[in-house]
Amino acid sequence: MGVPALFRWLSKKYPRIVSSVQEEDPKTAPGPDGTEITLPLDTSTPNPNGEEFDCLYLDMNGIVHPCTHPEGKPAPETEEEMMVEVFAYTERVVNMVRPRRLLMMAIDGVAPRAKMNQQRSRRFRAAKEAREKHEEEQAALAEWKAKGLGATDDEKKSKRAWDSNAITPGTPFMDLLAASLRYWVAQKINSDPGWKDIQVIISDASVPGEGEHKIMEHIRRQRSHPEHDPNTKHVIYGLDADLIMLSLATHEPYFKVLREDVFAADNKPKTCNLCGQPGHFAASCTGAAKKKSGQHDEIAPTPPEKKPFIFLDVATLREYLEVELNIPQLPFAFDLERAIDDWVFLIFFVGNDFLPHLPSLEIRDGAIDTLLRIWKKELPAMGGYLTNHGRVELGRAQLILSGLASEEDEIFRRRKEDEDRRETNRKRREEMQQRRDKELDQGNFGNGSMVEVMSKKRRAHETEKPAFNGVSAQEARDQANSSNKSYDPRKKAIVLGGDNNQVVSDRNAARQANMDAAEALKAELMGDAPKQQEADAERALKKVKTEAGAEPTTASVEKQEHGDDQDSASAGTKRKADQVQHHANAGDDDVAKIEAATEDGDADADTDANADANADAEVDAEAEDDEEEDNDEVDGNEDVDPVTTIKKRKVNADGTVDYEDTVKMWEPGYRERYYKEKFGVDLSDTDFRRSVVKSYIEGLCWVLAYYYQGVPSWQWYYPFHFSPFAADFEDLESLDIQFQLGSPFKPFEQLMGVLPADSRASIPPAFHPLMTESDSDIIDFYPSEFEIDMNGKKMAWQGVALLPFIDEKRLLDALKERYPLLSEDEVRRNGFGNNTLFVGNESRLYDFLCEEIYAKKRTTDDGETPKRVAVNPALSGGITGFVKPDPVCVPGSTFNSPLTSQALHDIHNDRSISVLYDFPEQKTPHRSVLLKGLKPPKRILSAAEIDWVKRGSPDNRGRGRGRGAHHGGAGRDFHRSSNGQQHNNNGYAGGENGSAGYRGSNGGGYGSHNGGGGGGYGAPVGRSHDYQQYSQSGSGGGGGGYGNYGGYGGYGGSGYGVGGRDGGAYYGGYGGGGGGAYGAAPTYASAGAYDAYAGYGGSGGYGAYGASAYAPGAGGNRDNRYAAYTQPSMHVGPAAGRGGRQAAPANHAGYAGLPSLGAPPAPPAPPTHPAAAYGGYTNGGYGGYGAPAHGYGGAPPARGGGRGGRGAGSRGAGRGANNASYAGRGGAYGSFY
């Protein structure tokens, strides 16, 4: 499904859903000739993962695509060799899961028309890119020859790569694939003990429907029959992100999604993009010859390691969603199954294969969290759920879209600010790297070679890799390697992440910007000082000059020309889907990390939190822009640069496209400009906009029905390239949405609808003139050149190909005239086929099929057509359906091999049997319910993890940011010590135990000196060494931050939740909610007024909830609603928590805290004026949330004042610090701008 990085985003937000797959390594033994041979695994033994699975479903397109161009070795030269790769990969997957009941292998058949538009766009772009790449290679070869240099035989041949567009139903390749899989299944049944009891269903490309949807159709129909076991354990393999949504939609809890580990590639050793050798990067390449492996370089390189696999556990995801989606005090009963359906539906808005997503919704901008926040807010008013067992409740959808519409202007404005900031950083990096490249170019790297011709662009791209937080690697290196002997680890962190002003304003300082820059920086930090590096570089240049006369070897030329592409593809290039490998400027933390809303009922606070999230995701978004969709339709032409399809536009070496965005969503009037440019109409044309809205709503209804009930219409499609705005959706309840089922295209009709003329080799010759001759009635369907609208995006692959939509009637009329010219085999390939069921002779079904299907030869009333027979579920393990004879099967005969060239021989005395198989009838419509007899899966989330989810952070930070007692779980990875504690120079830590700490009862943990944790929901009795521990046995008081390095304060019950102490000017943590987060008075009068504005300390300590602390006033007043502001004897009004103070020179103060959580009744002695919330003192941070007064930024006795905070009431605008030269900007009513 078209939701880039959704799998990664989910695995980061809900980390327990992912687990590693354990594989059993095959054993080896000496063969007859003495060489080692690999012994087959005995998959009848227990599963090494400690869990047995019943059914395994393979979305085969996710296997076939990568097997046509496997990683780490040359691509197969013939299609038969590709089949062998498919067998090997499939066997590995089956060996991991070891299904005990059913294996289903589904290949994409003819797709619904709604999907064909996307297929058409992908295939046209892939073919065009392949053609232009081939032309580029030919031009480079000609330039090479013009210099009088020789070329290798391979270069002389320079044949075009295999056309991956052949992986489309109806082609000879797909016909060979179907025959090959049937052979392989029969061979496994005959030879593998682990296959003796399982049933295998093959649904090849002749059966209409997308592979994953055919699988889900099978599951839905099975569960509508009483024979279905609701505790069946399912596993589905595939690369599409929508497998997660489809699995949830089945409402079968025991479901896992299997795929390659998308994070594994991040640990892969990097090599130079110029010479292909490890140990250095292109910027420091000396052109040295490759070191020999053995005397004559005869030792083969180590074969690439197999990529690990991971499970995504749907049961655990359901457990997370139960916490995430459960809204307290709903006016109707909470139904998890229906809530999950709503969540799936909201994901469709962010991306799917059938509709363009709304302009305001980008997963990188936090779109899912935005929609979920709106859903939570509107659900009580909706009176029920958005969806109803696969049907959209349009009136309720109106509320969601109206809520989104109210935020669209702000979303576009924030997006532009983020993009401008990233662009500024990118240009800074570019300038820095260009200077370095210029210095390298001054050294003569040889006298012109083909490597230069083919690698020039790669080299330019290599030098543009971004560094940490906009600081170039050189700048960071110079700072880190400075001659200052008083090295401070906190200063090192600042070098890597920018100063704390950047941390506060840009929010990207703690992010690893990219893996290559990180490794380069790490290597260079371990090396020599800058002067010595210059000397080394000078020596290297001299060495190159002395060796310049020697021509590069053929091996090195080929390595430089082709090998590096396998490890570092250009930014715009399609990735191999099984790799999900990053472009060179992507880091290991490359999922957009969106921070959730912070406080229920506080919409403005939610908006502010999203603003922080957008800034947090800056580096992540840059990496994600390079990462294409999770999808099993991956083009085989990895080395192709799609930017070549964008004409008359400047394309940067990193794959971004320079163009003028004339719509300018961030400026007033964008709707008028959008409709004029994208649709060619005026915004005032309400009838047209209404037609677009209706088509889009039809699409949403179509997609939901497709996921839950099956194809609602084979002919429907969205007839526009662009979507409307959320503000355009009005009066949805009045729309009448109806679908006609129709029938699918035939295979050749789909081929002619989605393939370009460049791929006509996969189409029968009879149809070629329709694609190439100028007098063809449908020649306009096959443009060789087409416009790509960047639609506000920056990466080439994100552009929209403006291809003409296929007119179904014109296409079918043109094809009809040429059908008589087809051969007999082509007529067969153009027909629809059947699913095939295989079992072995040890299966309980074998005798049943032999007797009922092949012995009795039942027929229908015409005496010729075979009659369908119902499968006996008692023999099949509960699997139902209908079977009839397979015309090519003769039990006990010879199974002929379709791959004789690969030494795969015929199977004599075949012990397998095959029959044609139909899914069972759908007894009742699919319902979003759990079936009777289900044994609920074991819950795995701990109380702490549940609480973490409730606080809503997708990247290990809780909703308590700036909110005093609220904690944020584990600290960030970059500064983490054991069990989630934050290191010294950061001012907050998670509420977990430290590396040398103890845990109080019910979660009142405190930690070691590295970031001592905060109190939880109660702590043990205070001890003499627990410096600020105020609690009583059984009181439930929150534990305070421990010692000098305080972390969060706890939730006070009747106890006292105390924040961390100063700790020598810079290790203060969050304040603890002073006197109980929600105003509970402490039990000890000696507590004092300290915690009314707890959280002092430099390096970013957050302030606490003020004005709820106990503070003895004049005459011993014990009123817990008011706190002394500066002196215990003086009331000045409701005290807001102050930010961190007393920072070291390199550190900066933090946020101020909140004032009282509610309007208290008047005290005996009312305050003279309300208190303001002040930011940190030194190098002021953000201002706090004021009471009815202004929220001031940090008072700046030293350097700059911080930004103003949120005020309240008519006088409560946020103000900056009172320093003319360093004042931060003020913000009105909570804006952080």
UniProtKB/Swiss-Prot annotation:
InterPro entries the record matches: 5_3_exoribonuclease, Xrn1_helical, Xrn1_N, Xrn2/3/4, Znf_CCHC
Top-level taxon of origin: Eukaryota
A single GO BP: rRNA processing
GO MF assignments: 5'-3' RNA exonuclease activity; RNA binding; zinc ion binding
GO cellular component: nucleus
Coiled-coil intervals, chain numbering: 117-148, 413-439
Keywords carried by this UniProt record: Coiled coil, Exonuclease, Hydrolase, Metal-binding, mRNA processing, Nuclease, Nucleus, rRNA processing, Transcription, Transcription regulation, Transcription termination, Zinc, Zinc-finger
Cross-referenced PROSITE patterns: ZF_CCHC (PS50158)
Function: Possesses 5'->3' exoribonuclease activity. Required for the processing of nuclear mRNA and rRNA precursors. May promote the termination of transcription by RNA polymerase II. Essential for vegetative cell growth and chromosome segregation.
The protein's name: 5'-3' exoribonuclease 2
Species the sequence originates in: Mycosarcoma maydis (Corn smut fungus)
Gene: RAT1
